[in-house]
Regions:
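Phosphate-interacting basic helix/loop segments used at nucleotide- and nucleic-acid interfaces
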Residues: 72-96, 198-199, 280, 381-387, ...
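Metal- or metallocofactor-binding catalytic centers and their adjacent structured scaffolds
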Residues: 161, 238-270, 278, 443
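N-terminal cationic and glycine-rich segments that engage phosphates or anionic surfaces
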Residues: 273
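Intrinsically disordered, low-complexity regulatory segments
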Residues: 1-166
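C-terminal or mid-to-C-terminal helical accessory/interaction module adjacent to the motor/catalytic core
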Residues: 133-216, 261-262
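Structured, non-catalytic alpha/beta "coupling" segments that mediate domain-domain communication
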Residues: 27-55, 193-238, 387-434, 606-608
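Basic, low-complexity terminal or inter-domain segments flanking catalytic cores
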Residues: 2-3, 39, 116, 171, ...
Length: 673
């Protein structure tokens, strides 16, 4: 029997359909889902079916952390049914093929499966790799199997071990220092902490920003037949008196001093790699984790190529004309027709070129009827980006004019899209057109209106998910496969609110303490160094053991520094957490409102002045509370979110929520009467 192992059940189903020509049937192997045809069984895993962990003797959080980080780690099954199914199938197998995703994680998952198989039967194991789940790609891969890349898998093992050791040690230290144990623990990690520091640092700059007023002068002008808008050449006036004097000096007419018209070439975008794709999806309002989940589903179903890639250069073997030709019918027919009319299709090229996977591109034609709305939105983004990379540059007509009105210099700029080029296919990149008529030097135009507008300087914007992922990529924080997961984890742990990314008080407290006493943890340099070393495992330059030991030595020094400052760190964290637990001001006595617990263990918003003041508001019995930085405009109380599992729901203002509940009860009683 030929056993084929895939990374997920949906991938197993797809590969079985392709290889069997649709003749495969669903079955169970020791309770695990599988697909059978002829003498072949395709079994899907659930990602990693084993994990690294510390042995039971190190589960106590009172364990000395220096001992913990040097303790041996053990492999623990996480999906016992699938492990049992894999072992059962291995007994009957005379050939095993690993068909997991071709990246570091996929190679490690494949090695994990191979190890389980070999523990049952010493059978031959080969490896297939593909970048698209299309019949052509999958069948080609199975015609030319290779071996598991042990160096690539070992790199994944090293990352697992390093992340476990750093995460466990730092999380235990921070949580015990803050006296936050159980479900209320505070997490930290080698990638998580510097990423959170970026978000906190941006929030700090926003809080420290002091707005300054400035004034701008806007002028409406007209020729004999057309109108246009201009600004004062000074742009921003820092002094109101100067701005007032300037606008009063502008007369009823203005004379054209210079006029220039030029054409600007607007190059098409580069092919999508993971980072650019997530940034583009984020701009459409799709969270990074949601975008990646959707892209993975599209890949597994055969609609797009593998979405985890650093590559921004299409490989020579990709037939661009054939890829466009499949869209000659359907919703993108006109786009395809325009591209196919070109004598030669030449794609743009980005700076990053790798040999594992191509950039993300469509592999099958879909219609809206084939996909649910979210999947279609992502699929359309990928298709349109692909078309844009094969298109001509857009062209803009740029016009610039300077004018003089009684010695005051004015200016205006016009921008018109003269040739749409790639922008026809990719409407997401919006640039506002501004009309400016053709003028000539010495021409006199009429001033029809002038306006002095007061504005103020604005603080830097909070990170969007796409922007942060680009910054993480630039700083070497995480990998293309993990960056969106890091952001998701920060939200789940109560460290950030999303869209845009805004740190909670807990996040600020933890980051501030780490920055003060162990800045190495919050800086990207250490993490980037470890990532570079793990990349060297892939090439065989370094061993997994060397990298793990090197990382552990760094962590040992960090922990020693933290130990020396334990009392100060504990005090800093607890003070910060107390401030974060404040909901608002008590309307009865003006003391702080905090989250309290009753004698029976129930929680509520209560006055810190208890027992003198007994004001209180109810809270949900279950779920993890997150007190956000946003406040109710009516009651000046901080809004609360409740985490249930991996999802959050808005409780809102405790006072508003309670008042609404009281009103509903009154209405229900009246209806009953």
């Amino acid at each position: 029997m030929h056993l084929i192992v895939t990374e997920k059940d949906i991938a197993a189903k797809r590969i079985a359909e392709i290889l069997s020509g649709g003749a495969a049937s669903a079955t169970k192997v020791a309770g695990a889902n599988a697909y059978r045809f002829n003498s072949t069984v395709v079994l899907g895993l659930r990602g990693h079916i084993v994990k690294l962990d510390f042995s039971d003797e190190y589960r106590d959080w009172k364990t000395n952390l220096h001992d913990l980080i040097r303790a041996d780690v053990v492999t623990v099954p996480t999906h016992k049914t699938i492990v049992s199914g894999l072992k059962r199938a291995a007994k009957d197998a005379d050939r095993v093929t690993i068909a997991t995703d071709f990246d570091t994680e996929g190679e490690l998952i494949g090695l994990e499966a191979c190890t389980i198989v070999k523990s049952v039967k010493d059978v031959g194991v080969d490896r297939v790799r593909f970048s698209a789940m299309t019949p052509i790609e999958v069948k080609r891969a199975f015609r030319s199997p290779t071996r598991i890349d042990l160096n690539l898998a070992r790199s994944g093992e090293a990352r697992q071990a390093v992340d476990l050791i750093w995460g466990a040690a730092l999380t235990r230290f921070i949580s015990t220092s803050a006296k936050r144990l159980g479900n209320r623990f505070l997490s930290a990690g080698r990638v998580q902490s510097p990423t959170l520091a970026l978000i906190v640092d941006r929030e700090r700059k926003i809080a420290q920003f002091v707005s300054e007023p400035y004034w701008e002068i806007y002028i409406d002008l007209s020729t004999s037949s057309e109108t246009f808008h201009a600004k004062h050449q000074a742009d921003r006036f820092r002094n109101k008196a100067s701005a007032t004097a300037a606008i009063q000096n502008i007369g009823d007419t203005a004379t054209v001093v210079t006029f220039a018209k030029t054409e600007r070439v607007d190059a098409p975008p580069k092919p999508f790699n993971t980072t650019e794709f997530l940034a583009a999806a984020s701009a459409l309002g799709i969270s990074a984790s949601r975008a990646m989940e959707t892209a993975e589903r599209l890949y597994t179903a055969g609609w797009i190529s593998y979405p985890r890639t650093d590559n921004t250069v299409y490989p020579n073997e990709l037939d661009l004309r054939l890829s466009v030709s499949m869209f000659r019918s359907g919703p993108f027919a006109e786009n395809a027709r325009m591209l196919l009319e070109k004598k030669q299709l030449v794609a743009t090229r980005g700076k990053k070129q790798t040999t594992d996977h191509p950039p993300i591109y469509p592999t099958m034609r879909a219609t809206q009827a084939d996909l649910e709305p979210q999947s279609w939105k992502v699929y359309e983004l990928v298709v349109r980006r692909f078309f844009a990379t094969l298109s001509d540059p857009a062209r803009w007509c740029t016009k610039k004019v300077t004018l003089d009105s009684r010695g005051e210099q004015l200016r205006a700029t016009g921008l018109e899209l003269s040739y749409r080029g790639w922008r026809y296919h990719y409407p997401y990149a919006q640039t506002q057109e501004r009309y400016l008529p053709d003028l000539h030097e010495g021409e006199v135009v009429t001033v029809t209106n002038k306006q002095l507008v007061e504005k103020e300087t604005q603080p830097p914007q909070r990170w969007g998910q796409g922007q942060l992922i680009k910054k993480m990529d630039e700083l070497g924080l995480g990998t293309k496969s993990t960056r969106h997961e890091i952001i998701k984890k920060l939200a789940q742990r109560g460290y950030v609110d999303v869209n845009p990314l805004r740190p909670t008080g807990i996040a600020c407290s933890v980051t501030q303490s780490l920055e003060r006493y162990a800045p190495t943890i919050t800086k990207p340099e250490m993490t980037r160094l470890l990532e570079e070393e793990m990349d060297k495992i892939k090439t065989g330059t370094l061993s997994k053991e060397f990298v793990v030991v090197s990382s552990t030595n760094i962590l040992d020094m960090v922990l020693s520094t933290l130990d020396e400052q334990l009392e100060e760190i504990s005090k800093s964290l607890q003070e910060g957490l107390r401030g974060d637990a404040t909901v608002g001001t008590c309307p009865q006595c003006s003391s702080d409102l905090i989250v309290r617990r009753s004698k029976r263990g129930g929680r509520f918003v209560g006055c810190s002045g208890y027992p003198k003041c007994t004001f209180g508001l109810p809270l949900p019995k279950s779920g993890r509370l997150r007190i956000t930085a946003r406040k109710c405009k009516e009651h000046d109380m901080r809004l609360i979110k409740v985490q249930s599992g991996k999802r959050f729901w808005d409780l809102g203002c405790p006072q508003c929520n309670y008042s609404s509940w009281v009103e509903k009860n009154k209405s229900a009683q009246k209806a009953g009467d």
